[in-house]
């Protein structure tokens, strides 16, 4: 099974994106987040798809069910490969998101995979309990959210690799787990708290990893990509 290594294009604009992509092998699986999408709009997705890349559009929708359904119907027309929502929006919202994707997917294309964000990798247990008022440990909160996502018909969830084993225990091994917060051992942790190396994510069973600064901020992005790819593929 090919498990994706997804590069986070966390850049300000299309020019910065093109400069980064010039340094990397092609085609890639890339993540377009809020900053780049809000700066450049759907045209940047069209360009990436025309160049042969797979795209994870990371907008983390979280609104009332009808609004999310209508938004997902529009996002499906872009031909992206993965989109996401916040699981905290609830089962009805997540189910509506899937309905919107199915309605908007062009005939002959596969529906984008729909995954749910459980807890951000910048969240620690103190924040979970004191700020979000979730009186559970991280494993309990994430596994509960994963079960809700599966109930709503999602394809998988976003979580730290540390929670992947318990997600698979509750939702089965075929339930997709996409893991951000990936760092090489020598890298700065930045604003992430629940981080792992590519090798650790592979061992814990992540389906895909999302890597940003360890590649994009490296002196030699292509060399960093190759190191991470080898660790991930084993």
From Swiss-Prot:
Keyword annotations of the record: Decarboxylase, Lyase, Pyrimidine biosynthesis
GO molecular function list: orotidine-5'-phosphate decarboxylase activity
SUPFAM superfamilies to which the protein is assigned, alphabetical: Ribulose-phoshate binding barrel (SSF51366)
Active-site residues annotated for this sequence: 60 (proton donor)
Domain of life of the organism encoding this protein: Bacteria
NCBIfam families in the cross-refs: PRK00230.1, pyrF
Similarity field: Belongs to the OMP decarboxylase family. Type 1 subfamily.
Subunit comment: Homodimer.
Protein name: Orotidine 5'-phosphate decarboxylase
Organism (species): Halalkalibacterium halodurans (strain ATCC BAA-125 / DSM 18197 / FERM 7344 / JCM 9153 / C-125)
